[in-house]
Amino acid sequence: MAPKAAAGKKPAEKKPVEEKKAEEVPAEKKPKAGKKLPKDAGRPDKKKKRAKKSIETYKIYIFKVLKQVHPDIGISSKSMGIMNSFINDIFEKLAQESSRLARYNKKPTITSREIQTAVRLVLPGELAKHAVSEGTKAVTKFTSS
């Protein structure tokens, strides 16, 4: 059954497609002074490049120390990776030990004293003595500046 048409009413006139689009889409906004549009704003079809994840390593510092000690010697990337892992491992052990010491003494803060004691416990003999002296020197330099 066909729908009943109201007597005397004319069907709504259709507007051309172009006029409809012009009414629906607001005029383009001009960028405010001082603000820049992203580079890809004009090209929506291109994919955005992913930002590189920054990976923190000790590679540059290892290299600087190597050049201070032996300026004529290089280091392979595999060896550099091993050294980086070694430093991360030692720092983790020191952090765990200093955390444990702070907990034993019921202190909420890890101070230079806990770090120093952790160094003495984690590192063996002569290495611990050198590390403590260098650490004390660094803390003194930091507090004086």
UniProtKB/Swiss-Prot annotation:
Record key words, sorted? Acetylation, Chromosome, DNA-binding, Isopeptide bond, Nucleosome core, Nucleus, Ubl conjugation
For bias type Basic and acidic residues, the affected ranges are 10-44
Q: Which Pfam families match?
A: Histone
Q: What induces it?
A: By wounding and methyl jasmonate.
* Residue numbers bearing the N6-acetyllysine modification: K9, K35, K36
SUPFAM superfamilies, alphabetically? Histone-fold (SSF47113)
**Keyword DNA-binding part of the UniProt annotation:** yes
After translation, the protein is modified as follows: Can be acetylated to form H2BK6ac, H2BK33ac and H2BK34ac.
Q: Name one GO cellular component term.
A: nucleus
Where do we see the Glycyl lysine isopeptide (Lys-Gly) (interchain with G-Cter in ubiquitin) cross-link in this protein?
A: K141
Q: Which domain of life is it from?
A: Eukaryota
Q: Where in the cell is it found?
A: Nucleus; Chromosome
Map out region (Disordered) in residue numbers: 1-52
Tissue expression remark: In anthers, floral buds, pollen, petals and fruits.
Entry GO MF terms: DNA binding; protein heterodimerization activity; structural constituent of chromatin
Similarity remark: Belongs to the histone H2B family.
Its quaternary structure?
Answer: The nucleosome is a histone octamer containing two molecules each of H2A, H2B, H3 and H4 assembled in one H3-H4 heterotetramer and two H2A-H2B heterodimers. The octamer wraps approximately 147 bp of DNA.
Q: What does this protein do?
A: Core component of nucleosome. Nucleosomes wrap and compact DNA into chromatin, limiting DNA accessibility to the cellular machineries which require DNA as a template. Histones thereby play a central role in transcription regulation, DNA repair, DNA replication and chromosomal stability. DNA accessibility is regulated via a complex set of post-translational modifications of histones, also called histone code, and nucleosome remodeling.
Name this protein carries in UniProt: Histone H2B
Q: Which organism is it from?
A: Capsicum annuum (Capsicum pepper)
Phylogenetic classification of the source organism: Eukaryota, Viridiplantae, Streptophyta, Embryophyta, Tracheophyta
Gene encoding this chain?
A: HIS2B
